[in-house]
Each structure stands twice: as structure tokens, then as C-alpha cells.
Amino acid sequence: NWRHWWAFGGGALGDFGCHYLDLPHWALGLGAPLSAEVVDGPARHPDSTPPWLIVRYEYPGSLAGRAVPILAGWLRDLKLTWYHGGKKPALLPANLAAKWDSGVLFVGEKGMLLAGYTRHVILRDPNFADYADPANLDSDFTQHHRNWIQAIKTGKPAPSDFAYSGPLTEAALLGNVAFRAGCKIEWDSKNLRAKNCPAAAEFIHHDYRAGWKL
């Protein structure tokens, strides 16, 4: 698969990161991460992407992205961990791990929420047993093509415009940079550079071979 060669793609993070990191980014109003660090992974290969990987991101406590009003003011520093290649969180019950090939596990103080794009499961703490699921929330989101056309016609931002999708993509690819550079990346999003790891520079601003410029 072409996605699994560094010369052409970004592996699982480059392929699925923007889909699954989208859920916490959208739900919690996240922007660019403060750091990215590989918790566990295979040996690095110069040409091919890792078949499995665990990456931990840190985000600021203040909502740096599109703030979600219901969350603003109480969200503390947040840690987000990415798993792929069959790796799953130890907190995930075995019966659910067997049924869910992919998803996002939100871990809170009173329970956990396992979510995908079409289903979710609430894992309650005993003290949280009386919680009632909210009614479906109204949403302005429409099909991809339709909201793109609406943005063109009305001039209003699309749900995944560059202001949102830029930091999201940045986060996904930063995990790859941390893996390839072999160090925790303290990230300067404004200047798109690693503050602490010179080895990361070549994976952030790459000089491509001649013959591929427009």
C-alpha cells in the first residue's frame, strides 16, 4: 500500500489520524498539541511507516481551537494517546476490545465514553449510574459535498475549514515526526518547529527531489 512508504504517505497516522483525532478535536475544541511522544513502537525503518505505534500528545488546558461553550472554563491540561496496529488502551474492557476494531475512548472522572462515527457506549462509574443520555443535539453539519458548496455560496466557513483541519492534520503528522526523530517533540505551532529536537527539522520541512514542482 502506497500509504505505508514515507516517500508517498504517512502510514496509519497519516491515513486515519485525521478521522479519529477529529472526534476529540471537535468535541473538546482542541487546537495544535503542545507535544508528541512515542510511548511504544517498533524499530524505525528508513523507508516504511510503522505497522503499530502508541503516541501520547499533550494539549493546553485553555481551548485553543474552536471553543465548545459547554466545556470552556473547566477543561484542564489534556493527554491524548493514539494507538494503531492492533494496540488498544488497557482501560478498554476485553468484551468491547473484541467488538471494536477502531474508535475513540474518552476517559473522564465519572466514567468513560467509547465512540465511533455511528455508535457509542457509555461506561459508567457506580457513582455515575443515574446519568441519562441526552437527547440528540441539533447539528448544522451536512454531507461533505453539500457543506463545501454551501461555504462557496454563502461565504461562511465550512465545518472542516483550514482553521480547524490545519491543527488537526498538524497533530496527526507530529506523531510521525516524533517517531522518525526518536524524541519527544516540544511543539512550536506558530513557527512549525520542534523547540527541543533538531533531528525533527528534516521531517517537518523536507527538501524533495527535483522534478516534482509546479
Locations of the language-model features?
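Predominantly a Rossmann-like dinucleotide-binding segment in NAD(P)-dependent oxidoreductases
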Residues: 1-38, 44-47, 55, 61-74, ...
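A structural signal for well-ordered alpha-helical segments within the folded catalytic domains
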Residues: 11-14, 18-25, 142-146, 163-173
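Short, contiguous acidic/charged loop-to-helix segments that flank catalytic cores in large enzymes
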Residues: 43-46, 95-97, 128-140, 152, ...
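C-terminal helix-rich "cap/oligomerization" subdomain common to oxidoreductases
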Residues: 47-48, 151-214
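Short, glycine-/Ser/Thr-/acidic-enriched flexible segments
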Residues: 60-62, 86-87, 111-113, 118-121, ...
